[in-house]
């Protein structure tokens, strides 16, 4: 039997989740860390930069999907591994900062897979059963959060709208992968899933690589950018899987009502 009234502790957890999920600006975080405006960095890239970024994002998500469909279910839970995952991603970022845009095709699939495993560990710590393909694809979904084209700040156009849109894509992909695996990556449900996530992930990658490609950034700056990058997705993952955990306790409708009653920074909610 589900609980109907949220405890004070769970309300606070939901507020923290909303702060992360509705204020996902990776560009602002990178700017604050390095003092280099992302908009200015984007203007310094060559005219053809979007093609390799798009290809790299697509390749990274395709690689991550194979991990999600297979070995991700063996990921251990807990958040203690966050520091290790950060260290590994930071190391790949040092190479990206030293070699710039040409290194992206090599660096991004590696760092994305590491981030996916970190996301999965957070998911399991929040009670997700990673033997379920839907839970594993929910890990992949984190890469699509915060990269919503044309997003406005209304609550209905934020996190829950993104989840609703992804849910339609995920159901078809989960059914196909559950029945046939990933033997045919060109199958329409799989293609739609990869394209959906890659498009949104690519927006965030563009902001990352724009700053990373600035000549003065170098290896140290590239490492710092990757630290900010994985920390961003770890925060989004914790928010996402906190909401899902609370939905399992109180039901989706109750959690959604509380979530939408809060301001975007989570500072106010329904009085209890």
Kindly label every feature range from the protein language model.
Residues 1-92, 117-272:
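Terminal, membrane-proximal amphipathic helices
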Residues 88-106, 113, 117:
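Glycine-rich active-site/cofactor-binding loop and its immediate structural neighborhood
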Residues 107-111, 222-225:
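Short hydrophobic alpha-helical segments that form membrane-spanning helices or hydrophobic packing faces
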Residues 110-113, 233:
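Bulky hydrophobic/aromatic packing residues
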């Amino acid at each position: 039997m589900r609980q109907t009234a949220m405890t004070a502790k769970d309300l606070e957890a939901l507020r923290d989740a909303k702060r992360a999920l509705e204020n996902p600006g990776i560009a602002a975080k990178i700017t604050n860390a390095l003092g280099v405006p992302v908009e200015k960095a984007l203007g310094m890239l060559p005219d053809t930069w979007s093609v390799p970024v798009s290809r790299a994002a697509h390749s990274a998500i395709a690689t991550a999907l194979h991990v999600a469909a297979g070995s991700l279910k063996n990921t251990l839970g807990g958040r203690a591994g966050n520091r290790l995952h950060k260290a590994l991603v930071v190391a790949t970022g040092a190479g990206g900062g030293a070699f710039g845009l040409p290194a992206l095709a090599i660096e991004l699939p590696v760092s994305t897979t590491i981030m996916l495993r970190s996301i999965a560990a957070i998911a399991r710590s929040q009670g997700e059963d990673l033997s379920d393909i839907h839970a594993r694809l929910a890990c992949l979904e984190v890469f699509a959060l915060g990269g919503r084209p044309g997003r406005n700040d209304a609550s209905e156009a934020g996190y829950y709208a993104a989840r609703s849109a992804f849910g339609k894509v995920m159901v078809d992909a989960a059914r196909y992968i559950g029945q046939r695996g990933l033997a045919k990556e060109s199958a329409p449900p799989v293609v739609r899933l990869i394209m959906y996530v890659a498009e949104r992930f690519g927006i965030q990658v563009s902001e990352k690589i724009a700053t990373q490609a600035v000549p003065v950034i170098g290896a140290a700056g590239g490492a710092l950018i990757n630290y900010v990058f994985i920390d961003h997705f770890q925060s989004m993952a914790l928010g996402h899987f906190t909401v899902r955990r609370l939905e399992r306790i109180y039901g989706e409708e109750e959690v959604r009502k509380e979530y939408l009653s809060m301001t975007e920074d989570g500072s106010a909610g329904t009085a209890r």
